[in-house]
Amino acid sequence: MTDPVVALVMLGILVSTIMIGFPVAFTLMALGVGFGYYAYFQPDQAFFDNRVFYLLTQNTFTVMNNDALVSIPLFLLMGYMVERANILDSLFGSLQVALRAVPGSLAVATLATCALFATATGIVGAVVTLMGLLAFPQMLKAGYDTRLAAGVVCAGGCLGILIPPSIMLIVYGAQASISVVKLYAAALLPGFLLAGLYIAYVVGLAVFKPARAPALPKERTDFAFGQVLLMLAKSFFPLAILILSVLGAIMFGIATPTEAAAVGAFGAVVLAAGYRSLTWQSVREAVYLTARTSAMVCWLFVGSATFASVFAYLGGEGLIKSTVLGMNLSPITFLLLSQFIIFLLGWPLEWTEIIIIFVPIFLPMLPHFQIDPLLFGVLVALNLQTAFLSPPMAMSAYYLKGVAPKHVLLTQIFG
């Protein structure tokens, strides 16, 4: 039984329930099973003979057997172990000293640390929170403008969405059925270019408005070259070698993303051991967080696949596609419109919901407009990175507010 109107009602209920805080994965599954039972209903069938139950079990098996998704828990474990290696403090300190001659050195060191740490973890909230605890108070103490300091931490922390090994790009690749390796290669340059533009802006601001980013006192910048090199050798180079090993193996085809992620996870454990922070407590926390996040992503995929199958069967996907194609949009107009919608969705929703629920609505239309899914995916990542920085619902600002000193107002962070 097909009915596009029922499909649109199904989509409307989904959006409404997500907005009021229902668990997304189980909402998707519940709506998929409920409306699927209606769609596949046959009067002469027993209750559990309905096709929707076969669809649910088949989707569960398919998701759990997806090679692209196997790398997610391994990259997450790598990120959580690096996070618990207590390397961030020494990394930030060494980069701060190494960049001491650069105007706005504290902010530049913060952005460089965020970019490097994002490359090692791919976890946005973790980077913003950790740098909010470490770098934000130091910038305020050094006399930096509160708005500039907050913007640097939030912008730098969001780089993990775009810079490989971004978990978001893996999920997008699984949804769009394209190579994660190609996605990483496509996103690497834009990610570091964006980080470079952030740094250039901070340096320019420090040069022309030094009151907003004062120079550090001489006693904090008086280090011999050998001391700087030793500090970098202890903090920067080990992490850089780990990152280059993982990304290099992926980019040059030496290993698949899953194999490289496994090497990265093992390397992160070795790194934690080298910094004497490998404890039973840290391993247990990292494994628990990895399992929790991985389970969330997997069940989101199961729910999304079930919902999407029923939605398409009812005629909802065909209705949306025919409506959009009937508007006779140019490829550029379609690209701008779709990215604008994704940008608006990035205010109230997490990237997981956007990539798994809403992006697949646009994917079937890309061939008609001759838009490369790789380009579309990189633009989505860049777009969401911007949305997570944009008031009134900038998620990175709320991450920072949670760890910022009490006198720092949310309006100052938004500013």
Feature map (PLM): residue ranges:
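Alpha-helical transmembrane segments of multi-pass membrane transport proteins
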Residues: 1-415
